Amino acid sequence: MEKTYNPQSIEQALYQRWEEAGYFKPHGDTSKDAYSIMIPPPNVTGSLHMGHAFQDTIMDTLIRAERMKGKNTLWQVGTDHAGIATQMVVERKIAAEEGKTKHDYGRDAFIDKIWEWKAESGGTITKQLRRLGASVDWDRERFTMDDGLSAATQEVFVRLFEEDLIYRGKRLVNWDPKLHTAISDLEVESKDKKGFMWHFRYPLADGVKTADGKDYIVVATTRPETMLGDTGVAVNPEDPRYKDLIGKQIKLPIVGRLIPIVGDEHADMDKGTGCVKITPAHDFNDYEVGKRHSLPMINILTFNADIRDAAEVFDTNGEANDAYNSELPAKYHGMERFAARKAIVAEFDELGLLEEVKDHDLTVPYGDRGGVAIEPMLTDQWYVRTAPLAAPAVKAVEDGQIQFVPKQYENMYFAWMRDVQDWCISRQLWWGHRIPAWYDNYGKVYVGRTEDEVREKNNLASVVVLRQDDDVLDTWFSSALWTFGTQGWPENTDALKTFHPSEVLVSGFDIIFFWVARMIMMTMHFVKDEEGNAQVPFKTVYMTGLIRDENGDKMSKSKGNVLDPIDMIDGIGLEELVEKRCGNMMQPKLAAKIEKQTRKAFEGGIEPYGTDALRFTLAAMASTGRDINWDMKRLEGYRNFCNKLWNASRYVLMNTEEHDCGMAEGAELEFSLADQWITSQFEVAAKEFNAHLDNYRLDMAANTLYEFIWNQFCDWYLELTKPVLWKGTEAQQRATRYTLITVLEKTLRLAHPILPYITESIWQSVKPLVDGVEGETIMTQALPQFNEDNFNADVVADLEWVKAFITSIRNLRAEYDIAPSKGLDVMIKVADEKDAARIQANEIVLTSLAKLDSIKVLAKNEETQACATSLVGKSELMIPMAGLIDKDAELARLDKEVAKTQGEIKRIEGKLNNQGFVAKAPEVVITKEREKLEGYQETLVKLEAQKETIAAL
C-alpha cells in the first residue's frame, strides 16, 4: 500500500476495472432472490448536483449491500428526455451560434438537431455518475425516447384512450406566454411581489340598489385587465350586505355586458369588499366558481398574452357559445397584458368608477424556464381521467403493498390522491413523444399506434387527408412508465418477470405527486402478475429531504451557493470556483455579492476530498426525510476518517505481511482478551449495520462503521495489540496477527457499500493473507452478518473494564498536570475478586498503555497516603500524589481556575436573573446559557475537590 491515502490515484482506475469486468450486471442465477432499483432518470441536459449525489449514494449503498448478500441485483440506469428543458437548451444554442430559431429549421430538422446535441453533450451526467462509484448496469442504460420506451409510451396512450381514460377537452392550464406551451405545476415558481389591489365600482343593472342605497357594488382585484372577460360577480350567500342581490345583474363597465351576481362561498365576507369578480377563462378559482354556476367562459388573451381582437366565448364544457357577443373595445386590440392593465385602470378612473387603490403583497406564478408570469389559459389539451386509476393506487398503500419511509409521507400521498384532478398530458413543444392522434379535415380525431393502423381500423381511404396532432406528451407521462417500460413491457420479458416490481424508489418529496403517485397509478393499471393481480412498481418509497447550504438555504444559481459534488471529489481553485458561480448568471447584478461570499467561505478554494469521503458524509447526514444543511467540516472529518482507515490498514499489513498469521491448520493460537473483544465488537457492528440498512437509516449505519473503525478498532484495539506484538509469546502473537488481518478483512467488507473505493483498494492487499478468501473483487464477497458464536458478553465486559482503568489514569494525569510519559505507581481497592482477576490477567496491557511502573492491589482495610482517586466500575483507583507535583504551584494554578470559573458563573447568573434578557431572548439561547451554567458549576465542584486533595499532601 502507498504510504498516504490519495483517492485521485485509485478511484477512476478501479471503477474502469469494475465496469469492464461486468461486476455491475445481475449475476443471472434465478435460484437466488432478485433485487432491483430503478434510478430516477436525471434530465439528459443536466449535470450532477448535490441532490443526485445524495440519492445516488443511498441507492448504490443499498445495491452494493444486496449484491454482497448474493442477490441477483439490477440497478437500472437511464436518462429522461426532459422535453421543455432540452428544447430550450438547443434553441438557445442555435440562436447563439447560428442566429436561427427552431422555425427556421422546421420540426423534423430541429428534432434531428436535438438528437445531434444529445449524442454530443447528453452524456455529462452519466460520466459524473461513474465518478460517484454508481454500480449501475451500463449495458442496460435506457433513454425515455429510445425505441422501446417510445413504443411503450404509445401503447399506454392508445390503451387508455380505448378505455375512455384519455380525452381531449378545453380547460384551464398554466400557460407560458413566452414558450407557448402548457406547463405543469412543478414548473411554476411563485414569486413574492409588491403590487396593488384596485377597487372598482360595478354598476347594478335595472335600477337595483344595495342595502345601503348605492347603485353599484365594489369589487377588489389585482388583475384589472381580466375584467374584459368577467362573466359574473360572486358574493357570500350569508353576507347580509349582498345576499338580496343574488340573482340580480351587473352592467360591466367598458364592455357593457350584463353579468349575474351569484352566491358562492368562494367570496369571503371578511376579505376585501366581499364581492369577487369572476373570470372563468383566466383564473383557476374562478373557473371552479363558473362551473358551479354555469357561467360562460370568455377568453380575452392570445397565446402571447396580448388582448385579442375578438373574444372567444365558451360554455362550461368548452363548447363554442353565443351567450355573449365576442366584441372587445378596439383600443385594446393587440395590447400587451400589462399595458392593458394600466389602460383599463385609467379608463375606470376617467369613468369615475375607480374607488381606491391599495398597496398589496402578491404571489405571482412564473414559468421557471421561460421566466415570465404564467397565464391561466383556456386551451384544447389532452387529459387522463385519474380518479379510476387513483383508487387502486390508494388501496396499495393502505394495505401495505407499498410503504413510505418516513411513514408521514403517506398522508401527503393520500391527501393528493383522494382529491386527484384530471392530468393534462399534452405540451405544445416539438421535442418529446408526439401524441399518436390524427385529425381529418372535419376535425374528427382518430387514435392509433401508427397512421396505417388508424386508416385500417377506421376504413379510411388514402385520399382522406390525415394530420397528426402537433403536441407532445408531458415528460412525466413517459417517466411514469419507468419501472416497467425499461424492462421490455408490453412484452412479458424475462427482465420484467425477474426485476419487477423493484424494491425501493429513492426520491425527493417534491415530486411525490408528479412522479411517484403517477408511477403507482400507471404500473398498477398495466402490469399484472401471473395470477392477473395488479403489480406495484416498488415495495418501498424512501423519501429524502433536500440538501441545503450551511445556513439552511436552498441551493440555487441565483443565490450563488451551489456546490458541485465533482468539485468536492477533485477539488477546485478559488478563481475557478468564483468564475463557476458568477459566470452566465440570469441576474448578473448579483455577481459581486456572490463573489464576495465565495471568497470569504472558500479562501483557498475546495481541496480534493475524494468520492468515498463525499459518500460517507452524505450517508452520515441521511436521516430519513429531513433536509440536510451541508457542512464542509463534516466532509473534512470524514476524509480524515478515510485516512484513519488507510493508516490503520498499513499498520495491520506491516505487522502481518511476511509473518505467521496462524492461517495454517492446527496452528497454536492464544487469543488475548483484546483479540476476543474486537471479534465480539465486530459482530455487534455487523448486526447494527445490517439492521440500519434494512430500516433505511444510512445515517446510523455510517455512524456504526465510524464508531467501530475509529474508536474501537483504531483507537483501542490497535493500541492493545502493541504489547502483545512486542512482548507476547509466539502463540499470542500469531493469534493477534490472525485477529488483526481477519477483522480488518471483514471490516472492509462491511464498509464497502458506503466506501467502495478505499475498501477495494485495501482489500486487494489484505486478501492474500486471509485463508479461504476467493474472488477478484470485494464487490462480490459476502456482506458480514451477525454470528452469535463469535460474540462473548463476558469478554466485552472485561475489556470495557480495562478501557475504563486506562482512561481513568489518563484523565487523572490531565487533571493534575502529570506528564503522559511519567511512570506511575498506582493502587487499587478492588470491589470483588472479578476485578482482581482482571488486573492479574491484563497486567502487561494495563502497565503498558497507562504507562505504569506498578499496580498494587490493596488489602481490605489498608490505609494510604493522600491520593488522587477515580472509580473504575465499583473499584477505587488511587495515585499517590506526594512528590509527583509542585504542591504550591498546582494550588496557585487551581486558584486561578476557580476564580475564572466563579467569574463565568456570576456572569451567566446575572444574565439569567435579568428579566429583560429572559423576556426578549429566544428559548434556545436561554437553554444554552442554562446548560453553560450547569457545566461551570460542575467544573467548580471538581476544582474544589482537586484543591482539597492537593492541600492534604
From Swiss-Prot:
GO CC terms on record? Answer: cytosol
> What sections of the sequence does the record tag as coiled-coil?
884-953
As for subcellular location, the record says: Cytoplasm
Q: Please tell me where ATP binds in this chain.
A: K557
Q: Name one GO biological process term.
A: valyl-tRNA aminoacylation
Query: What InterPro entries does UniProt report for this protein, alphabetically?
Result: aa-tRNA-synth_I_CS, aa-tRNA-synth_Ia, Anticodon_Ia_Val, M/V/L/I-tRNA-synth_anticd-bd, Rossmann-like_a/b/a_fold, tRNA-bd_arm, tRNAsynth_Ia_anticodon-bd, Val-tRNA_synth_C_sf
Question: Which keywords appear in this protein's UniProt record, sorted alphabetically?
Answer: Aminoacyl-tRNA synthetase, ATP-binding, Coiled coil, Cytoplasm, Ligase, Nucleotide-binding, Protein biosynthesis
Spell out the CDD domains in the cross-references. Anticodon_Ia_Val, ValRS_core
User: Is Lyase found in the keyword set?
Assistant: no
The reply on keyword Protein biosynthesis is yes
Q: Do you know which Pfam families this protein is assigned to?
A: Anticodon_1 (PF08264), tRNA-synt_1 (PF00133), Val_tRNA-synt_C (PF10458)
Q: Which reaction does it catalyse?
A: tRNA(Val) + L-valine + ATP = L-valyl-tRNA(Val) + AMP + diphosphate
Q: What is its EC number?
A: 6.1.1.9
Q: Where is this motif: 'KMSKS' region?
A: 554-558
A GO term for molecular function: aminoacyl-tRNA deacylase activity
Enzyme group, top EC level? ligase
| Annotated motif 'HIGH' region, positions | 42-52
PANTHER family recorded: VALINE--TRNA LIGASE, CHLOROPLASTIC_MITOCHONDRIAL 2 (PTHR11946:SF93), VALYL-TRNA SYNTHETASES (PTHR11946)
Q: Which family does it belong to?
A: Belongs to the class-I aminoacyl-tRNA synthetase family. ValS type 1 subfamily.
Q: What is known of its domains?
A: ValRS has two distinct active sites: one for aminoacylation and one for editing. The misactivated threonine is translocated from the active site to the editing site.
Summarize the subunit comment. Monomer.
Briefly, what is this protein's role? Catalyzes the attachment of valine to tRNA(Val). As ValRS can inadvertently accommodate and process structurally similar amino acids such as threonine, to avoid such errors, it has a 'posttransfer' editing activity that hydrolyzes mischarged Thr-tRNA(Val) in a tRNA-dependent manner.
HAMAP family documented for this protein: Val_tRNA_synth_type1 (MF_02004)
Its protein name is: Valine--tRNA ligase
Question: Which organism does this sequence originate in?
Answer: Photobacterium profundum (strain SS9)
Q: What is the lineage of its organism?
A: Bacteria, Pseudomonadati, Pseudomonadota, Gammaproteobacteria, Vibrionales
